Curated annotation (Swiss-Prot):
Its EC number is 2.6.1.21. Homodimer. It catalyses: D-alanine + 2-oxoglutarate = D-glutamate + pyruvate. GO terms for biological process: carboxylic acid metabolic process; D-amino acid biosynthetic process; D-amino acid catabolic process. The lineage of its organism: Bacteria, Bacillati, Bacillota, Bacilli, Bacillales. Pfam families: Aminotran_4 (PF01063). Acts on the D-isomers of alanine, leucine, aspartate, glutamate, aminobutyrate, norvaline and asparagine. The enzyme transfers an amino group from a substrate D-amino acid to the pyridoxal phosphate cofactor to form pyridoxamine and an alpha-keto acid in the first half-reaction. The second half-reaction is the reverse of the first, transferring the amino group from the pyridoxamine to a second alpha-keto acid to form the product D-amino acid via a ping-pong mechanism. This is an important process in the formation of D-alanine and D-glutamate, which are essential bacterial cell wall components. Belongs to the class-IV pyridoxal-phosphate-dependent aminotransferase family. Keywords: Aminotransferase, Pyridoxal phosphate, Transferase. This is D-alanine aminotransferase. InterPro entries: Aminotrans_IV, Aminotransferase-like, BCAT-like_C, BCAT-like_N, Class-IV_PLP-Dep_Aminotrnsfr, D_amino_transT.
Length: 289
């Protein structure tokens, strides 16, 4: 397996990171995950635009143009012969010796790019049968719109869900539902798609954006606004979405069944529209059972 370290492809076992790298010591960096279908990137530009936007919000300079970055990632995918999978890439602020919280202004740090590509099949069974979720207080920082390497709050929530045999943790600040530990959450109520507004309390998921777009194109009303735990529990349908899980229904929350406990009709419609978008961009799909 080859991975990318700056502009070099190296064997996985030969890849190293400096112990004084600010990403390693502070989580000072940003990242993205881009999906591949049939060896082709899906919503690549949207992901990379978000990467550069996140970097700009923390005054981090990515040392490659968007065109140079795409060329590097395409080489990474080709070298590893990825058909259906994910590319994980991150950029840290770089090496600072000695370690200091303050970003130096007397010399520029050189950002460090790393990336890896892996084959990850689609999970059609999960898309249909769904999964369960727990609810958990959202204790993360207040700039969740930045796709930062700082993920400890997400990790703790996700691990708590795992310990309870749940797929996800749905996060809330008081009564207000925000998102999940590793995905966005949406509900369907009286035929309306309802999802949290794209503000600083959530990451504006690329899959979320595609879902909103196809919903509007197909006449499904969309409401981008806060909703409560009560709204969540009384919803007709609940689903989570992300680059890796596409659109996955939630059948139970905190052990309580959502509606009839099955994927709802609008969730199914939205996933079909989503698959059509993938097919247009990347070709016909093969489902993993």
């Amino acid at each position: 397996m080859k991975v990318l370290v700056n502009n070099h492809l190296v064997e996985r076992e030969d890849a190293t990171v400096d112990i004084e790298d600010r990403g390693y010591q502070f989580g000072d960096g940003v990242y993205e995950v881009v999906r591949l279908y049939n060896g082709k990137f899906f919503t690549y530009n949207e992901h990379i635009d978000r990467l550069y936007a996140s970097a700009a919000k923390i005054d981090l300079v990515i040392p490659y143009s968007k065109e140079e970055l795409r060329e590097l990632l395409e080489k990474l995918v080709a070298e590893n012969n990825i058909n259906t999978g994910n590319v994980y890439l991150q950029v840290t602020r770089g090496v600072q010796n000695p370690r200091n919280h303050v970003i130096p202004d007397d010399f520029p740090l050189e950002g460090v790019l790393t990336a890896a590509a892996r084959e990850v099949p689609r999970n059609e069974r999960q898309f249909v049968e769904g999964g369960t979720a727990i609810t958990e207080e959202d204790v993360r920082w207040l700039r969740c719109d930045i796709k930062s390497l700082n993920l400890l709050g997400n990790i703790l929530a996700k691990n708590k869900a795992h310990q309870q045999n749940a797929l996800e943790a749905i996060l809330h600040r008081g009564e207000q539902v925000t998102e999940c530990s590793a995905s966005n959450v949406s509900i369907i109520k009286d035929g309306v798609l309802w999802t949290h507004a794209a503000d600083n309390l959530i990451l504006n998921g690329i899959t979320r954006q595609v879902i909103i777009d196809v919903a509007k194109k197909n006449g499904i009303p969309v409401k981008e606004a806060d909703f409560t735990l009560t709204d969540l529990r009384e919803a007709d349908e609940v689903f989570i979405s992300s680059t890796t899980i596409e659109i996955t229904p939630i059948t139970h929350i905190d052990g309580v069944q959502v509606a009839d406990g099955k994927r709802g009709p609008i969730t199914a419609q939205l996933h079909q529209y989503f698959v059509e978008e993938i097919t247009r961009a990347c070709g016909e799909l093969v489902f993993a059972k």
